[in-house]
Design a protein with these regions (language model features):
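Extreme N-terminal starter segment of soluble prokaryotic enzymes
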Residues: 1-3
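Local cysteine-cluster metal-coordination motifs and their immediate loop/turn environment
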Residues: 8-12, 38-48, 75-81, 131-139, ...
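Immediate flanking context of iron-sulfur cluster ligation sites
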Residues: 29-38, 62-63, 68, 165-175, ...
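Short, structured active-site "lid" loops
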Residues: 50-71
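Glycine/small-residue-rich loop that forms an oxyanion/phosphate-binding "nest" at active or ligand-binding sites
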Residues: 89-96
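Anionic-ligand binding region
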Residues: 146-163
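A short, acidic, amphipathic alpha-helical segment used as a generic capping/interface helix at domain edges
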Residues: 191-203
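Conserved small/polar residues in nucleotide/adenosyl-binding loops
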Residues: 204-212
Length: 212
């Protein structure tokens, strides 16, 4: 299988080490991965702000960039969820069929559901606390949402359990929003900041904080 690595614009600009680590990780587990150099934003900021025509142009560009790959994999649940859930609507109104939505995965989802490694040659003898993102939980189903009465599961915890020496914890309110929410953080910065501070406090008071 041939995988195209989708790196969202905020990761490219602010956290490039995440993109590099994603590429190395996929290579390490035996994936034939490529990084299309001309890729750009998926269009989520424009769509969230109401500029659907601009978002559609970027969606079409992304379709062209990734059309020859079996899978599209990205290290961002939010951007992956936008492509999966919103690109078909945006492009469908313009008589274009969205192919990326059928083959795009968050990197954790891809490792868990497609690659399915039975072990990882990794050692991390520390306590860690999981951040369950809103889009990851409720749109990509990376873990069970707390508001639904269904059995607990966590694809993130499953993957981390393959790392030797690690102890995994979750905060008391496991999937509370961090306050980012894309445009919400820009339009409501004060509320967003307070929500982020609450989230940090939850993580700091989890059992993983004892390892500091």
């Amino acid at each position: 299988m041939k995988v195209g690595l989708f790196i969202p614009c905020y990761i490219n600009a602010v956290y490039p080490e995440v993109g590099i680590a994603s590429y190395k990780l996929l290579k390490h587990v035996g994936v034939d991965v490529d990084y299309p150099m001309d890729q750009t934003c998926c269009g989520q900021p424009m769509a969230n702000a109401g500029f659907e025509d601009e978002a559609a142009r970027l969606a079409l560009r992304m379709e062209e960039q990734f059309k020859n790959y079996d899978y599209v994999v990205g290290p961002s649940a939010s951007c992956v969820a936008f492509v999966k859930e919103n690109h078909p609507h945006i492009l469908g109104k313009r008589d274009h069929v969205c192919m990326n939505s059928k083959k795009i995965y968050d990197i954790c989802e891809f490792l868990h559901d497609v690659v399915r490694p039975e072990s990882l040659p990794a050692v991390f003898p520390h306590k860690v606390s999981i951040h369950n993102s809103c889009h990851g939980v409720r749109e990509l189903h990376l873990s069970s949402p707390s508001e639904r009465n269904i059995p607990y599961y966590s694809k993130l915890r499953d993957l981390l359990s393959l790392v030797k020496g690690i102890e995994v914890f979750e905060p008391k309110r496991v999937d509370e929003c961090c306050g980012f929410g894309g445009m919400f953080a820009i339009e409501e910065p004060e509320v967003s900041t307070c929500m982020g501070q609450d989230k940090v406090c939850l993580l700091y008071t989890s059992d993983a904080a004892d390892d500091r």
